[in-house]
Design a protein with these regions (language model features):
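Short coil/loop residues immediately preceding or within conserved phosphate-binding loops
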Residues: 34, 96, 221
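Conserved RecA-like P-loop NTPase ATPase core
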Residues: 17, 45, 68, 82, ...
Length: 233
């Protein structure tokens, strides 16, 4: 699976991630859904990258990939974004609009930071998963949806379950397969491989001759704790 080479690294932690992805994607059923996947780990550990890899390598690769950052949308608008709305459902609803679940029909819906999903939206999402239907705001009609779900969280969902901030039944629907994305500080010398890749990319982008990391630079990279991990466009 050559595409998994995007998950650069040789540490045991990243090997475990690749092995689990291989098991999940080795024989994907054509046209069918993969089991729901929950990606856990700190911010900046590559959960979005893995979500896109699973979509591209899975049986829904020819369908849409629709991503939503759950806390980035105001709670008052989230249900309309996810489930859609009919004309006149609220003051500014001048035209009917399908929601993101319908936009992801026969493809993949990526729910980023799903642990921060409001309780009301959790209940409607559970219905969509279990019954494979959605009902737009202002509508009395349910419409079929066929979606593969991938979710991600950097919060402790077990604590949220104990505190009753997250529905237990929804958790089990979303976490059929769980995958932990390790932080950089858990990946040892992988940081050097990543740094060298980004350095090579920067040299190419700016028309500079290839460069390598010196011993002092390597030592400082390895000694750093990498709070927030690493993001690179």
């Amino acid at each position: 699976m050559d595409e998994l080479e995007e998950l650069l690294g040789e540490s045991p932690a990243i090997h475990t991630v690749r092995e689990k992805l291989c098991q999940l994607l080795k024989h994907p059923p054509a046209g069918r859904r993969l089991p729901a996947v929950l990606l856990q780990g700190e911010t900046g550990t590559g959960k979005g990258l893995v979500a896109r890899l699973v979509h591209r390598m899975g049986p829904r690769k020819d369908g849409p990939f629709v991503a939503i950052n759950c806390p980035a949308i105001p709670e008052t608008l989230l249900e309309a974004e996810l489930f859609g709305f009919e004309r006149g459902a609220f003051t500014d609803a001048r035209h009917a609009k399908p929601g993101l679940l319908q936009a992801a029909h026969r493809g993949t819906l990526f729910l980023d930071e799903v642990g921060l999903l409001p309780e009301a939206a959790q209940a409607k999402l559970l219905t969509a998963i279990e019954e494979r239907v959605v009902r737009r705001l202002g509508s009395t009609r349910s419409e079929a949806v066929d979606v593969c779900f991938i979710s991600a969280t950097n919060t402790d969902l077990q604590a949220a379950l104990r505190a009753r901030r997250f529905r237990d039944d929804l958790y089990h629907r979303l976490a059929v397969i769980t995958l932990y994305m390790p932080a950089l500080r858990e990946r040892g010398r992988d940081v050097l491989l990543l740094a060298q890749r980004f350095l090579a990319r920067a040299c190419a982008d700016y028309g500079l001759p290839p460069k390598t990391l010196g011993e002092q630079a390597q030592a400082r990279l390895l000694a750093h704790r990498w709070p927030g991990n690493w993001r690179c466009a």
